[in-house]
Amino acid sequence: MVDNTQWFKRCVGSWSSQRRYIYGNSSEPDNITTYFSMTQTADDSFCLAWGSDRNSGEMNFVIDGDVVHRDIGYYSSAPTDSQMETIDEDTIVFHTTYGGITYREEIRLLLDDNVRLRQTIGTRNGKVNVVGQYYEVREDVSD
């Protein structure tokens, strides 16, 4: 079994994120810059805090084998579990369902763990609800 906690440890630090979203049938992309930081709070626990000109928040989560237990979801204030799929040592895919939408989120670490390429697709009843593309750059490393 892969120790998924190690992948999250590689993400600890402060990041800037250039994000592009397309919702439903909209042809207009929504671009946003978000800043986030990840800290390790225990051997298998982490905290993700984010902020932008539109919103801010904090999510705490625990790694349990190939499951992530989050205290909130990205689009929900309720606790959420995600199934993790390890593609290779640099890439993890999260599979999550809540609010009637199924999400597939892939994150790949690049350039000595200083860049993250991320993409998300959310579907409902076989139709695309949201697509997100993210270019994330490490700003500094937390201890």
Model feature map: region roles:
Residues 1-14:
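N-terminal helix-cap/turn-to-beta initiation motif at the start of protein domains
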Residues 89, 112-116, 124:
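Intrinsically disordered, low-complexity linker/loop segments enriched in Gly/Pro
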Residues 95, 101-107, 113, 117:
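Acidic and generally charged, gly/proline-rich low-complexity regions
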Residues 108-109, 119-143:
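Edge beta-strand at a domain terminus
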Residues 4-5, 17-47, 129-132, 139-141:
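Short, solvent-exposed loop/hinge segments that bridge or flank secondary-structure elements
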Residues 13-19, 116-118:
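A short, Trp-centered hydrophobic/proline-enriched beta-strand micro-motif
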Residues 47-49, 117-120:
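Hydrophobic core segments of beta-strands in well-ordered, beta-rich domains
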Residues 25-103:
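Central antiparallel beta-sheet cores of small beta-barrel/beta-sandwich binding domains
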